[in-house]
From Swiss-Prot:
Taxon lineage: Eukaryota, Metazoa, Chordata, Craniata, Vertebrata
Biological process, per Gene Ontology: calcium activated galactosylceramide scrambling; calcium activated phosphatidylcholine scrambling; calcium activated phosphatidylserine scrambling; chloride transmembrane transport; establishment of localization in cell
Protein name: Anoctamin-4
Gene: Ano4
MF annotations from Gene Ontology: phospholipid scramblase activity; protein dimerization activity
Glycosylated sites: N544, N824, N837
Alphabetic keyword roster: Cell membrane, Glycoprotein, Lipid transport, Membrane, Transmembrane, Transmembrane helix, Transport
Miscellaneous comment: The term 'anoctamin' was coined because these channels are anion selective and have eight (OCT) transmembrane segments. There is some dissatisfaction in the field with the Ano nomenclature because it is not certain that all the members of this family are anion channels or have the 8-transmembrane topology.
Family: Belongs to the anoctamin family.
Reaction(s) catalysed (UniProt annotation): a 1,2-diacyl-sn-glycero-3-phospho-L-serine(in) = a 1,2-diacyl-sn-glycero-3-phospho-L-serine(out); a beta-D-galactosyl-(1<->1')-N-acylsphing-4-enine(out) = a beta-D-galactosyl-(1<->1')-N-acylsphing-4-enine(in); a 1,2-diacyl-sn-glycero-3-phosphocholine(in) = a 1,2-diacyl-sn-glycero-3-phosphocholine(out)
Purpose: Has calcium-dependent phospholipid scramblase activity; scrambles phosphatidylserine, phosphatidylcholine and galactosylceramide. Does not exhibit calcium-activated chloride channel (CaCC) activity.
Ribonucleoprotein listed as a keyword: no
Amino acid sequence: MEASSSGITNGKNKVFHAEGGLDLQSHQLDMQILPDGPKSDVDFSEILNAIQEMAKDVNILFDELEAVNSPCKDDDSLLHPGNLTSTSEDTSRLEAGGETVRERNKSNGLYFRDGKCRIDYILVYRKSNPQTEKREVFERNIRAEGLQMEKESSLINSDIIFVKLHAPWEVLGRYAEQMNVRMPFRRKIYYLPRRYKFMSRIDKQISRFRRWLPKKPMRLDKETLPDLEENDCYTAPFSQQRIHHFIIHNKDTFFNNATRSRIVHHILQRIKYEEGKNKIGLNRLLTNGSYEAAFPLHEGSYRSKNSIKTHGAVNHRHLLYECWASWGVWYKYQPLDLVRRYFGEKIGLYFAWLGWYTGMLFPAAFIGLFVFLYGVTTLDHCQVSKEVCQATDIIMCPVCDKYCPFMRLSDSCVYAKVTHLFDNGATVFFAVFMAVWATVFLEFWKRRRAVIAYDWDLIDWEEEEEEIRPQFEAKYSKKERMNPISGKPEPYQAFTDKCSRLIVSASGIFFMICVVIAAVFGIVIYRVVTVSTFAAFKWALIRNNSQVATTGTAVCINFCIIMLLNVLYEKVALLLTNLEQPRTESEWENSFTLKMFLFQFVNLNSSTFYIAFFLGRFTGHPGAYLRLINRWRLEECHPSGCLIDLCMQMGIIMVLKQTWNNFMELGYPLIQNWWTRRKVRQEHGTERKINFPQWEKDYNLQPMNAYGLFDEYLEMILQFGFTTIFVAAFPLAPLLALLNNIIEIRLDAYKFVTQWRRPLASRAKDIGIWYGILEGIGILSVITNAFVIAITSDFIPRLVYAYKYGPCAGQGEAGQKCMVGYVNASLSVFRISDFENRSEPESDGSEFSGTPLKYCRYRDYRDPPHSLAPYGYTLQFWHVLAARLAFIIVFEHLVFCIKHLISYLIPDLPKDLRDRMRREKYLIQEMMYEAELERLQKERKERKKNGKAHHNEWP
């Protein structure tokens, strides 16, 4: 039995030929080993043990991979499980039902009229369009390339013409070789698994233990959905000369539908439509309006009358809907291999990254929830909250001019307790944890991406030399230089021209950032003016909570401004990017991505930065307030601190923005598609349901966003920034992000499967420029969290008081008993008679004690009015300031060291993956040698059989 032509399958004593049929020699060998009747006295277990012992002494060329042990499945085998080989009975049955299959193919709208040629691509145009000559030349050249074509008119509008394209096997093979499409490679060497007694015992004990464990609920049910099982195969670039090396069960399904569409699109991008070196490609025809749309077809309906568990999947779209896009599987893992097979590697990588990000949010959300619950459980023991709630004799100065009244410090008891929920002893730990978490997330994503790239054959994939954008060619067609790669002349942009355009673009970016700052300034003016208005409001609820009402309404107005400016920013970013005249589409995409991210990041976080680092920091003090344009007094923090304002800002913005994004992602396409169907029914003049072919159904769906996955990535990257940058002030941000992402995955899946036309299956090795942006956000989050803890929260002032000024000063303790008297020490005294005329409140405070007040308190570390330097900074202020600066420096250096250490310790490529890659390279070479040797041996046998002479070999 030769290793090069047979293999053992599933540990049984059957040997199958590499072509898939039963090998004759192996069958004869079985007959020799298994004599008839009573003569059988051979111990087969001893024979197998002997074979295994011999295998240990030779160089076994395959490791213990079950996937390598069986042939790969093609598209159809995923939907119709069973033997990959067909018997003569199966063939006759298929031939008898051939006419029925062809009729069914014609009716489902996925094939030509003959029911044999599958539609690989659709072009749409209107007969009334004047670009007739260009289309005719283009379509004539399409036929010259070997593609088959058919045209159909729309059922509801005869002006709309659908051009159906089909690529025959010869065309697919020729261009697959040019594009280096990797396909399953034929296995030539059988594998005998090594078995060690010790490992076998361990496996047996583990299997017994697993029987008592519940099934993993998040894993996809492979028993009821066997179609999800797809064997892994070694692949190699397709070659027509070595076509016999590849596993080809059916030429019609050897290239899956996504690959076929990608090959056809590749052909269309290189076909001329006019004479001239630049008059080439489908994209230019779509730009000038010659064609309205171009897209590959969905594989039929995503719904079925029968259950997928009992009748199986009707098509891959139905399979994806049931096991991925349906809300009933929200808690299960994503079938990423199926997503990649249907939508391509680029979209598959997006969902892989989104799933990885969502999974990594679980520990962050758990720790954040723990920090919040820790604040809840320690609320009754918090000395600061107790003192605030019991401070009925401490009267606070008004927080605004004229209309704001004096108030007891105890009136802010609720806000002090809420502040403790987010600003407690666990906050610093959580900030350090999140900084480390961001690094671990990125480092392990690199490892995860490497595994995915290996499984999806992206390790050695390199992007093709990109075509020059038509706009770039039109602008610089007069200046040319030789391309160092292709050796062909191409348009050239002078360095001075490029620099001048970049300067203008940078000026535009700076101007738009100034617009954001102006919007924030407007919000500040609104807060300053409104707090006085709410303080004089008739309703007691609003009057007594004027600051909270001001913050809440300001956040809502800020959200509306953010959404309006986003529309403006997109147009400005588009204008500035086109002004730069990028040479290729990838350069254009990277430039546009950076601008949009910068605009939206500043737009979304500018108000948050103001509240975190500026609100209440530069207000002055009673009697000497700082004012805007010498009129409006700057807003002060609440008596319980500014952190409550920051929490409200983050919570409201995060919830509103995620809700709006989810509506725009799913609700808006649903409404658009419903309106399109309604319009079609009205134009057709009937309310009855029309049975449209698949190409017309897909044409009525919404096209994918013009910027591809840009909006999907941008939404998640902004959320990542919101989750990490100010997480010290809002520990529940990871939990909100987790809940949103669980919904986001299914929303995006539902949108791709049901609401959008099928996008072209594109390849990509990683998430592109977004990874660098994520790294930048991770660095920024360390800095901002250090400042939030040191400046925005009261963590440092409490720490200084406990060690320096409290009852435990000098004892090295910092418990709750050491915080006695902290509230009184953090408040300064102001003499009411020192108020400015325009700041003096209408009330004299007699409602508190029956007599006019002489003094009130305010948050600051200043000397009393009767001291030698009235209202000057105290020594405690300078101690707190020094401690804040020291904390920022120590925190940043410590966290950055931890981040770099983690980055150094975690390799980008897992060791087992590195070994698998090296072994695969070796195995592919061995299989190529074995396959070539087998081919030569077959040719030699054929020559001998036919009696043809051949040259003698050297001895």
